[in-house]
Amino acid sequence: MKSDQLGRVLSDDDLPTKLSIANEFKAFVKKNSVPRDLIHPYFLTLSRAIKSREDPQLTSVCFSCFCHLFKRVSIQDKQLLDDSATVAVVTDLLIDRLSDRSTGVRATANKVLLDYWVLVPQAVAVAMRQSAVVSSSHVTLGESLKWLQSVFDLSSAFNFSAFVQPVVDMLRYPQLQSSVCELLKKVYSVSDRRELEECLAATGVNEMLKKSILNGLPGGNSSSAVSDPKTTAPRSLSSQKSVASKPAQQPNSQEPGNENAPSSSLAFLNSLPNFRVDSLAPENVYSASDLESKINNMHVAFADKESEKNWSLREKHVTQIRKLLRGNALQDYPSQFAAAYKSVIDGVLKSATSLRTTLSNQGLLLVKESGQLGGNAFVDPVMDIVFPQIIRLTGQMKKITSNNAHITVCGLLTSATFSTKLINHVTSATVEKNAQPRTFAAVWLRILILSHSQTHKSAMQNHGGLDQIEKAIAKGLQDPTPSVKENMRVTYWSFAEYWPSEADKIYRKLDTKAKAMLDKVNPSGAKNAPIKKPAPRESLKEVMRRSRESSVNRDANAPSATAPPQRAKMGAPQRTSSGLVGRSLSGSNLTDRSNRLSSTSTSSRDQQRAVSDSTRPTQMTRPVSGRLSREPSLTRSSRDQSLTRSSRETVSREPSLTRGSRELPKQRVDQNRQRVPSISRDSRYGQRPVGSRESSRQSRESSLDPSRESSLAPSVHSSTAISRESSLPRDDLPSYDVEMDEDDPFVTQQLKLSLKQEDAMSQPEETMNEVTTAEATATTAPMKIPKSTPPRESTPPNSSPFVLAKSPATQGVSTSPATGKSASPPATAEDELSRDLNGESKHLKEVDDDNGSMDADERIESDVVMGDAEESAANFEPSEVEPAGVQLGLKSPKRETPTSALQGNEQAEPESHDAVADSQSHGADSADLQSEPRNVPVSPPTTSDASNVPILSPRPIHPAKFELDSDAMIVDEVAPEVNTVIDAQTQAEETPTEEIPAVVKVGFDAEAKSEPTEQTEAVKTSDTATEPGEPVDIPNSEQGPSTEPTELAKSAGSVEHVTEAIQEDPFGDALPAKQENGAKASDEIETDHTKSNNTESDGPVSAHDESEPMEICDSDNDAVDNGTNPDTKCQDQQDSTTPPMDFSSHDLKDELNTSSPESLTALLSNPDQYKEILDHVPAELFLLCVILFSESHVMDAQSVISRDTNLALSTASSMVMVCARDVYPSDSRWSQATVEELKHVTVTCLEWLTKLVNESSEASTLLATNKRYRTSLVHLLSTSVELHKQKFGDVTHNSLIHVIESMDKLSQRPPDKRTSRAFLEAPSPSPDSSLVEDVTDKLSHVTVKENFKTIRILPPQLASGQLIFPGSEVTWSKLELERLARSPSCSDSNEAILDAVSRDKVSVTQLSTLASRIPELEDVDLVTATILAYLHISHPPALTTAALVAIKQVLIKPELKLSMGHVTEIFSTLNHVNSHIDSRSPLAAAIEELVADLLTHTDSSEMLEFLLLSRSRDSKTQNKLLLLNTVYHVITPDLLPSYETQLLALITELISDPDPLVRRVTVGLVVRVLRVSPEMEGTISLAIKSKMDLVRYYMGA
């Protein structure tokens, strides 16, 4: 068959013949080769048949033939497809098929194009670049992206440069963004991305979207994107993304200087899980009001406690805010978004602290991303609220929550602005009891140091932040938890990079082991660490060494080595005790234990603790947790050495009394012998440490060695002390806070064994005298102990009972802390106790000075105190007061201080230093443990400055209370001294809408009182005014508006009534002057005043109370009556004499519209005639003329209008809307006003509206109780928010948003039950407001075109079934086209405007200019396609309206012919726009009118088929309403039988829709179907069943 025959058959014959020929040709192509000269004609003929779209079946068969023909030719000869004419025909058809509605057709066309590119790559790529990737159909663009991905998968060498710009331009389509991002990441993962960066920058792609694309490429973010000053991401994000590909850094690397060493940047945050901003679908907003409405809708779910009902809503809202952060709100409305986020931060924190893990995670992610994406604008205002709660979450046991909270704090710290509060929040976590916050706090400190040490170095240093960080790091490096120390070491080196001198101070205070561990993580290597060798600490070590050597020498030279054993001399009972003690304290065993000292630092700490014990004042301390505190730094070596010395110092003495005795023996008093303090047995209930069993075994072995037994003597005083304590019940034993480890059973066992031999011990007088003489003559200078790391804070008692467990370093010279001289023992134990009690008050005040200034020689004292002192003090209870970490002593009964005790202090002798060295010997003199009594004051610990401060009184210091005088406050707030005079007439007329304090003296200060602009204009200064001290009374704001505003308004016309209003008493009683004329008004004012006090009021409230009368006197009122303000009175008299004008004789409305400014100024000069003028003209026109031509009387005009609250609110709202939208007739006064005049009118009306909403109780009650009325006003104002910003700027824009917010807040106010029901039944915006009627009510209904006549279907009139044919209604198109004729035009060409539209850079003026040129264009296909593609993107209402006007111009173009494909494309676009706007918006009416215009260009059957087959079941309410209304007007009697099934399915589905409006319109559709075809009633009744009663009601049956 020839090509011309095929073309003739496909164009002329009937449909069955065409289908038959097409199928035959397809069978021929499948089996036979095609002649070379017929290939191009065949392609051309089939292409024309497919594009004609005559029949869907024929189109499908022809396209199948086309594809088979292409396959046959490619098999036959590939060169045949390389012809330029063939390439043009084939590619044109295939690209056209990419936009087909059928998915299978689009997939086939895409596959054929890919095969064609393999054969002819250059030609096909050029065709795709010129047509497909720049198409106006987003469907074609999506298929083009698929084709490009397939091509790149086939060949990575594909030249993508020509496609970069159009592909980037596709990012303006939200539905294509994911595909574009995927393609770009795939292409530029193997290519140089500089071309992509340049293209993204030139196109102006959304910054966040650009970052998401570039971050997915190898290498992270680009330098240009990071350095872009417009980016809203914080500094930390840019730094972290620049190193995203680097491996995570490990702070504990074993190789210093490695790449895993600590870094000076914030790149380590990338290794933290969930720190990066994850991918989430963005959500865009269309205006600031849209954003605020979305946030306001979340307040209900966040309001109360979490429950099963609201937790899912909270999670949904939190996720929605996260999507909004990724949308356009952050770039277009940053300040409004930040304010909205702050308003819901409490609810977000409730979600973050929830026990539900999913909700908590979402809340924490939102808080983190608010800082990462929003920057410091989102973090700084809520810092004090967010940080404490999130830091508290890090201590939870649930690891997921604690880790997420840690990541959240990290994200906030990288975004917050530096302040000292930030450091306070972080350092507070370093002192938490829980280890987790302390571990995380090290990382937070590092972030602070790296972020702010360079830029805010002086601020950190001058405001205390540096000191806090330094203390926190020093504390963390010595923390008992390994993880805290591990993280803090890394933080230390970051700190040392910026503050080397402060870091060096911390380093020098560490011990050797801590320094070694710190050097391991040094980034510059341990060899370069600033190690400062401390001063030599060999003093204690040398003492121990000399002690061991002396002990060995004594054992070698002891006479007991060769002499017979002394067991017979000392008695049998000594054998067991001496053997056990001697064996356990043998020289070899002591040497082994001494070698266990880990380092010099340990000995140094013991020595420092000994100094602390020796310099502490004598006092008893309170118990700590019912047991003695354990000092971990005490080693077994020091305990053994103390035991050794104690055993060797003990000499044979007479037995002491047991605890049961309460009388001092006379012989002990005479000999002035001291007693050893008793040992407390409040141990850990028999716990045995490691090694104690071995010590017991060695003790038992030593008991069998007679030579060892003979070399030792029992400890007399230790056993005496134990005996004294053993007689007391265990529960009554006092607990002391000591540093020594008295829980060690090893020490306790030795003392128990010595106790058994207490009664059998005897000490000859000769031995005692020898020991005393030796100690008195062998006095040497005390040893010096170098300073070391301060031990932990702990307060030993004034007399430590564990003398046997003390280190030899503690047995130094006893000195007096008051005089610094040696202290001699008292005469008796009773004298010693008296001396302690007497000296306690003197020494306690000097503890801090002595601790800091005393030399080491003076601080080395003994820890031995008289045992009787302890016995006496044990009867007293310890104090429970422990302020500031300092423990106070016991409160002992008053006792007289004996003279002998005081004399004994003057005869003090220093203790011999040899006693310390000789304490290690194992000779027979081991019984000289406690030979001398000592008064040992104990110094407080030296861990910190705060702990060294002595607390002399437990009473807390309360802050001073400042009480302000109420009268003074009233004067400050109400009566500022300003020489002003208030116009009485103006104040009387403002009474219905203003609320000010009841009586005010003198006047108001502009800053002190937040009054509206109108009132401040009414305030005038005068040289002849009242004196500053003379008050001028102002009527009470609570008195207006009254229940009868007409009566009060009548009283505002003359001075007489004004005076009566002023003289009204604030408590309801009229003043005497001229009461008869104003009695009625006074009663009304008093009634309204009482009501206003009982209801809520948003206006300012007077500072006075009824129980406290204000300062008011008759002289003040007389001053007003006598004419204090003569100007006002004269003006009132002059106005009252003006004869009233008769307005009934001429057209006042026309006069206001057409008169000259001078005539209008004269006409509006008398405010007394305003009420009559308002009865003849609309309120909007009247107020407009007053504002423009008689501005001094604006307050009067507003007062007259405010008599009707409904009229006042409606007038102000409609004028605000009209000024922005220009919806006024061309011959009215509105059209003659300039933009600046309209802006002035808008500002004046907004101020008036603000005052009405916030200060008028009547207006606020009306808005709070009548939801329908409030919703109408809010909708009226919200539709012009964006227009205000574009036309007048941010001033009116922000004020309008404030008014809308104030109205919305009133919706949450509970209605007052005493409110009249007249408020609840108030009408919609005033009937007098004709403009409001035209713009709101008329535009909320459906507009369709049938037979070229406008038909409006009003839902209330569905019952009668009649259609209204109004003749003079104002439609949307008429208003917009009139505005289009008056709007300015630009000089850009059509091509330039279309290019701006395609790049989403077009303005409203350009769109309006393009719409005005459409009637002159011959070809509107390109314009239509470009505008339709533009409408697929969300835009502000002004741009959308202008684009719809252009579509309107296209649809009303004469002789326009549209195919069904064009109709469906336009309807789909309008339906898409309709789904993103409010159904109450005028744009909804615009779309309905455009659909009505579209129906005139299509066949009803095809349109109904399209509507019923292409409807989506998950569409929004707006789409359902548009579908129902369109079907309503497409239905005809001829079409019902063919589409009965589909129509019933639609009705059955939507009549049960959750939205009541959808159900109501569906009922209207059923009524229409039954009226068109009554025979379908049975079928419909069976389908909808119970809904038929409602249908019959509407039909009037």
Swiss-Prot record:
HEAT repeats lie at residues 1537-1573. Residues 610-622, 632-645, 709-726, 791-801, 808-822, 918-933, 1013-1025, 1036-1045, 1122-1139 have a biased composition (Polar residues). Keywords: Cell cycle, Cell division, Coiled coil, Cytoplasm, Cytoskeleton, Microtubule, Mitosis, Nucleus. Microtubule binding protein that promotes the stabilization of dynamic microtubules. Required for mitotic spindle formation. Residues 220-265, 519-958, 1005-1154, 1307-1332 are annotated as: Disordered. Belongs to the CLASP family. GO terms for biological process: astral microtubule depolymerization; cell division; mitotic spindle assembly. This is Protein STU1. It holds the Pfam family CLASP_N. Residues 1108-1119 have a biased composition (Acidic residues). One of its GO terms (molecular function) is microtubule binding. It is found in: Cytoplasm, Cytoskeleton; Nucleus; Cytoplasm, Cytoskeleton, Spindle. Transmembrane segments: none annotated. GO terms for cellular component: cytoplasmic microtubule; microtubule organizing center; mitotic spindle; mitotic spindle midzone; nucleus; spindle microtubule. Residues 535-552, 660-673, 694-708, 832-846, 1081-1091 have a biased composition (Basic and acidic residues). Gene3D superfamilies: Leucine-rich Repeat Variant. Residues 577-605, 765-781 have a biased composition (Low complexity). Interacts with microtubules. It comes from the Eukaryota. It comes from Yarrowia lipolytica (strain CLIB 122 / E 150).
